[in-house]
Swiss-Prot record:
Protein name as catalogued: Na(+)/H(+) antiporter subunit E1
Primary location class: membrane
Keyword Membrane: yes
Cellular component aspect of the GO annotation: plasma membrane
Transmembrane segment boundaries: 1-21, 27-47, 49-69, 101-121
Annotated source species: Staphylococcus haemolyticus (strain JCSC1435)
Signal peptide: none
Family: Belongs to the CPA3 antiporters (TC 2.A.63) subunit E family.
Taxonomic superkingdom: Bacteria
Cited function: Mnh complex is a Na(+)/H(+) antiporter involved in Na(+) excretion.
A GO BP annotation: proton transmembrane transport
């Protein structure tokens, strides 16, 4: 993947030097042309086409920011209520992620969303212990994490 990125930037700079126009637009055009060239030769270059990984990382960022916005609104509703009706609770989340960095990334994303804190990870790396500020049902919490954050973390980790 690193070879493909370096090759893409080299092709972009070659394009700038050959065209003689040293503008940002020309650099962007050279980058896009280089991206097409790298895509055409991705079968003979080592690794998968790198732009797919970048797309997955951007998708992870978008999903996280959507979850962050939803969690902020939920916590704001709890805080602005005249009488607190939230039910905090602990639960165990069973994850299917395999690598340590994926589990740590998921744990950090869960902790960064307001209203949830990861307390720990089991020794077998299969369970994540979570505290939620408003714990309605375990199934809702687990499904929310599994369908959004864990799904995109798994996609980023796939080769």
């Amino acid at each position: 993947m690193a070879i493909q990125i370096i090759l893409n930037f080299i092709l972009a700079f070659i394009w700038i030097f050959l065209s003689g126009s040293y503008t940002l637009n020309n650099l962007l055009l050279g980058f896009i042309l280089g991206l097409g060239f790298v895509y055409l030769f991705s079968r003979i270059l080592p690794g998968r086409f790198y732009f797919i990984k970048i797309y997955k990382i951007l998708k992870l960022a978008v999903v996280f920011f959507v979850e962050l916005l939803k969690a902020n609104i939920d916590v704001l509703k709890i805080v602005l209520q005249p009488k607190l009706k939230n039910e905090p609770g602990f639960f165990v989340y069973h994850t299917d992620l395999k690598t340590d960095w994926q589990i740590v990334l998921l744990s950090n994303l869960i902790t960064l969303t307001p209203g949830t804190v990861v307390l720990g990870i089991s020794d077998d790396r299969k369970k994540i212990y979570i505290h939620s500020i408003d714990f309605s049902t375990k199934e809702e919490e687990v499904e929310g994490i599994k369908s959004s954050l864990e799904k995109v973390v798994r996609e980023v980790g796939e080769d």
